[in-house]
């Protein structure tokens, strides 16, 4: 199983307000095995270079993401079905790249918490705080703009934020797996 998260510039605009098309800034993922615990999560990632970000060119990073995705028997993430997977597919088709294997099972932790739980919020950061985990750094609007302008410091901050998302997503996934397995549901099958 691998899990991944994306960070993309321009996620929430009216199409009339889009001056520059959105593109992938970075991606991060982690392999999950039977030995994976919240204390030994190894994150892999790729980020645009400053020059790529200035041009909005995510082609190279997309290739590395698809290579990573193609090695997995399952994909997992918080809202992966409604957001991450669809954003990847959009960027791939717009970059005239091949599609990863769409028969791979997707484990969506957002769908799972909505199906089995009723928390005050279903945001990943909120779940992690409630589970006693360290919260996520904050990305401000200006950080996103700096990334798009090719600011290396902002791109590094975005990648750290993205890696935190993956670590948090794995922690929630492992918690959900153990909890649901105790009730007879194996989300990894």
Feature-to-residue mapping (PLM):
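Cys/His-rich short segments
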Residues: 189
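Metal-dependent phosphoesterase core characteristic of DEDDh/y 3'-5' exonuclease domains
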Residues: 22-32, 39, 45-46, 74-186
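Conserved RNase H-like, two-metal-ion catalytic cores of nucleic-acid enzymes
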Residues: 1-70
């Amino acid at each position: 199983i691998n899990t991944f998260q994306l960070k993309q510039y321009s996620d929430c605009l009216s199409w009339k307000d889009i001056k520059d098309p959105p593109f992938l800034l970075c991606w991060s993922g982690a392999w999950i095995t039977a030995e994976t615990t919240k204390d030994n999560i190894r994150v892999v990632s790729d980020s645009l270079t400053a020059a790529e970000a200035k041009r909005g060119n995510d082609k190279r990073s997309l290739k590395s993401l698809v290579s990573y995705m193609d090695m997995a028997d399952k994909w997992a993430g918080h809202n992966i079905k409604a957001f991450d997977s669809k954003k990847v597919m959009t960027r791939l088709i717009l970059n005239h790249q091949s599609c990863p294997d769409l028969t791979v099972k997707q484990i969506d932790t957002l769908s799972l918490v909505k199906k089995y739980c009723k928390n005050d919020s279903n945001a990943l950061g909120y779940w992690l705080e409630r589970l006693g985990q360290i919260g996520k750094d904050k990305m401000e609007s200006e950080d996103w703009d700096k990334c798009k302008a090719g600011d290396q410091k902002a791109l590094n901050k975005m990648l750290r934020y993205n890696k935190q998302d993956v670590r948090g997503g794995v922690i929630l996934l492992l918690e959900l797996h153990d909890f649901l397995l105790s009730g007879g549901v194996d989300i990894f099958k």
